[in-house]
Structures are given as C-alpha cells and as structure tokens.
C-alpha cells in the first residue's frame, strides 16, 4: 500500500512539473509564430490600472504608462481606485487625459474591473496593477499577437525583483520556469491563465467577473478560451514587480491565490470537459488542477510513505530517497531562517521557496474550504 502511495505521489509531482512541460515541448517544438502590426497601424488600446490605496506608486505608474513607446492618440488610460481611502484618486486626477474612477465603497478587485471595463472605449483592453512597471516596448509587444484573429488575449512576462533591484532567487527562478512553460503552451494551443499584473484581451470577449471571485485574472482569461480563442504569451512584454517586503505579506498573497485556484474549479469546471474543449482540458488539468489540488498533499504523503517504507525495512533505495528528502527540507529550513533575516543564498532559497509555495497551497485549500478567504485584496508592503 505504502509503495503504491509513494509512487503515485511521486508520479503526480514529476508529471505536473516535468512530464507536462516535456510533452508540450515534444508536441510543439517546431511551431514558431510571429505576428505584428505595421508601424503607424497600431490598434487603439484602453489601459485599466487597478489601484487600491496606491498613493506611493500611482504617480510613477502613470509616468511609466505615459512614457510607453506607443502612439498617445491610440491610448485611453483608466485608473480604477474604488475603495481607496488615501490620495490615490487625487494624485491620478492630476495627470491629464487620465480617467479616474473612484467610489468610497470597497467591493473588491473583480467589481472594480467590471466597472472600469464599461468605461473602456477601445476594442483591446490592457489590465495592469499599479505596482507593476512596464518596459518601453512592452505595450507594442503585448498587442502584436492580436494581429492573429484567433488571439483573444495575451499574457505578459512577469519579473520579480527585490527593492534593491536584484532578482529574487526563489520566486524569480520559479517565474523563469513559468515563462518557459507559457512559451510551450502558446506553441501547443493556449496559455492556461494570465497573471493580473499584465495582460490584454479583446473587450468583446470579456465576461463580467462574479464579485466573490478571488482570482479575477484567471477567470477572465479562461473565459476567453471558452469562446474558442487563444491566450497567447508575449515574452518580450516585460513587467517588473517588487517582491513583498515581508514573508507574512507574501504568505497572505500566496494563500489567497491558492484559495482562488480552488474556487476556480467550481467557477470554471467546464474547462474539464474533454468533449467540448479537448486541448484546454488536457492543459487545465495538467497545469492547474494537479498543482492546486494534488501536488501539495502529494509532497506530504510522499514523505510520510517514504518514512514508513524505511521503517518497514524496504530496500535501500527508499532509504536514499528519504535522505534526499530530509536534506531538501533541511535546506528549506535554512532558507526560511535566512529569509526571516532578509538574507538569501541560492542553494537554500530555492528549496525554501518550493516548500513555502506548497505550504501556502495547503493553507489555501483549507482556507477556502472553511470559507475564510475574503474576496477583498490586501495590498502587500513593498
């Protein structure tokens, strides 16, 4: 029994993080697609900036947006500052040609996006966060794939750096892996979910987000797939985000995302209908369902079953595998101790981030099951 559990759990983890990407690579390694608009023919775009209590960064965000290499006559900029109790709306209003939407009632990010998108006047809408900085060419790179009529949405590239500007080794490495995976997904069929820091979609494909939705970005992008359009990935559409200032803030963010992932299974269950969406079902199950539901518990069961196999006198192979796991978790513990002191070392930080991420997934499952996760997003200190 324990041998079966061990191999099943190992299989789930290996397939989710290695097997699925390898399959995508094999099936699509020859596909190369490049779309672009000719200079002077760029489509008009509405940019929506979600900005709840972002007085510290909204000015720099708007300056960054206005400095993008894109025809200003083709841009509409909207700041959704709903529920903000600081000077976010006032600061944003000081910029010319910026539409500021502000009400005192706070309903959550999903409600803010639903309202803001009604004010978008252009056919392509870009959603971005106030704490995300874009490179000069990002908007052109993000919009280029829309030259293909089958493209319904485009996900940008996310980079996480420290306050000093250095890449965050654990999370940064994870996002490099995710970026590579998105490249393979784009070649195969579609990116499964887009990060809310930066993505674009055709306005006509937008489906209003239920107000109790936790991960609004995922809901919006999967609904694009439901209309048989692709979500592409633009590797050169770079957005940069400063990592959370504290482990506590990062923990809350990851638990919230994990809870949102579990919620998405009930909201977007038809993505698991292989008769209606065969390719999407394969990708959704392999990339999202396995990670959200199975991988974190599988890591726990893998360790427990390994311990029991060694105690029951199984072959030395299981003893070596257990020793590897112990060393891995020891490194993760050291990484945690270093992170508490705002220090990092690659050898320890990567195991720590992996454990931290999966522990947050477990907590998110429990939190959502208990109905404890609020739809209101809390801004992390950065």
Task: List where the protein language model places each region.
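Acidic helix N-cap motif at the loop->helix transition within catalytic regions
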Residues: 56-60, 74, 85-94, 137
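Membrane-embedded multi-pass helical conduit in multi-pass membrane proteins
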Residues: 26, 31, 38-39, 291-373
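Short aromatic/hydrophobic "clamp" motif used to bind/position activated sugar donors
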Residues: 125
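Conserved donor nucleotide-binding strand/loop of the catalytic core
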Residues: 72-78, 89-119, 157, 165-169, ...
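Short, acidic, metal-binding catalytic loop of nucleotide-sugar glycosyltransferases
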Residues: 63-74
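N-terminal membrane-anchoring/stem segments of glycan-assembly enzymes
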Residues: 1-39
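A conserved acidic beta->alpha catalytic loop
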Residues: 64, 81-89, 105, 132
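Catalytic donor/gating beta->alpha subdomain of glycosyltransferases that bind UDP-sugars
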Residues: 146-164, 168-177, 212-216, 220-287, ...
